[in-house]
Amino acid sequence: MSFVVIIPARYASTRLPGKPLVDINGKPMIVHVLERARESGAERIIVATDHEDVARAVEAAGGEVCMTRADHQSGTERLAEVVEKCAFSDDTVIVNVQGDEPMIPATIIRQVADNLAQRQVGMATLAVPIHNAEEAFNPNAVKVVLDAEGYALYFSRATIPWDRDRFVKDLETVGDNFLRHLGIYGYRAGFIRRYVTWQPSPLEHIEMLEQLRVLWYGEKIHVAVAQEVPGTGVDTPEDLKRVRAEMR
């Protein structure tokens, strides 16, 4: 099954300046992500960036770059610019791999593409079970609730679903009811084109979750349980230290 990986790599970061280029055991982080994408079997891999230094690092590693504007408000908007510049057909399967996930398993990159290709839906993503209370109550861990067919009902930073009977008695155990959303998406290129024509929704502003725009406009997102749990992403200097140790 043919698919394209696009890796948005925005240079500016308030918590970790120049994040795509931070060194992880002798390589820029963006190159590690590029290598994971290559292992997935993608037909084409494009790094979308707004910074020449990132472009040079990717090209030095033999990767393809698409220079994008610096004023995009979301990764999906950056993807849309690449889709137009590369003139992808509407049925092209695009996988958005975050540029700060150097430990993402190649298997789940392909999994999200396969899941999308097997369904008549414009967008697909992945989740993993939550087994501990700390993660269930952490607003930085985005939770997702599914319907009987595996389509998202809602994404939230809140603890959903709220296990009323359990939590009245005990906030230390969470049972088997929670899923943490992973920030990897598969789209058809035509769906990306439609997405960026929609006005941002009130819910996405409240939660700061751009995927809520899709649900707001009545579209479906398929969510599968990931075949592998990805390693730590890099948002902070502490994350970077942890990833360097894990990848040593």
Swiss-Prot record:
Keywords: Cytoplasm, Lipopolysaccharide biosynthesis, Nucleotidyltransferase, Transferase. It catalyses: 3-deoxy-alpha-D-manno-oct-2-ulosonate + CTP = CMP-3-deoxy-beta-D-manno-octulosonate + diphosphate. It is found in: Cytoplasm. The keyword Cytoplasm applies. InterPro entries: Cytidylyl_trans, KdsB, Nucleotide-diphossugar_trans. Its EC number is 2.7.7.38. It comes from the Bacteria. It is an enzyme of class 2 (transferase). Pathway: Nucleotide-sugar biosynthesis; CMP-3-deoxy-D-manno-octulosonate biosynthesis; CMP-3-deoxy-D-manno-octulosonate from 3-deoxy-D-manno-octulosonate and CTP: step 1/1; Bacterial outer membrane biogenesis; lipopolysaccharide biosynthesis. One of its GO terms (biological process) is CMP-keto-3-deoxy-D-manno-octulosonic acid biosynthetic process. Belongs to the KdsB family. This is 3-deoxy-manno-octulosonate cytidylyltransferase. It comes from Escherichia coli O127:H6 (strain E2348/69 / EPEC).
